Amino acid sequence: KEWHVPVSIGIIWFLWHYHYFYQNGIEVPLLSFFIGCIAESFVYEYLLQWSEGNLLSSMTYHFSWNLCIHLFAINPADNAGNEFPYILMTLFEVSMVLLLLAHDKSRHMHKLPTK
């Protein structure tokens, strides 16, 4: 599995949102946001592969993620500046990526050899 593709997309995605930090549009920790962009890129890649290239799965995940950030007051702008929920959510997502990568590695290890 190529790890550099989701990492590159995560960096580009982070740079795409970077200007919001200077416009006071994003009040989350910069490092956590950067790590989150890369972690989410791995999830999107997994969803795209799982759904055989259907973008709807990734779009639904992105929508759900953004909805949860505001619905459950994870965004520091929604909870009096507390950054802990956002950092915790980022750690959860990194854990999910590690599980997906372990599952993917395990799945490839159990394939029968072909002639």
Label every model-predicted segment.
Residues 21-28, 76-82:
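Membrane-interface helix caps and helix-loop-helix hairpins in membrane proteins
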Residues 6, 24-37:
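A loop-to-helix transmembrane entry motif
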Residues 16, 20, 48-52, 65:
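Membrane-water interface at transmembrane helix exits
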Residues 1-8, 46-54:
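Membrane-interface helix/loop boundary segments of multi-pass membrane proteins
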Residues 11, 15, 38-39, 95:
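Generic alpha-helical transmembrane segments of integral inner-membrane proteins
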Residues 3-25:
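Membrane-helix boundary elements
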Residues 56, 60-115:
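C-terminal membrane module of polytopic membrane proteins
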Residues 34-46:
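Hydrophobic alpha-helical segments embedded in the membrane of multi-pass proteins
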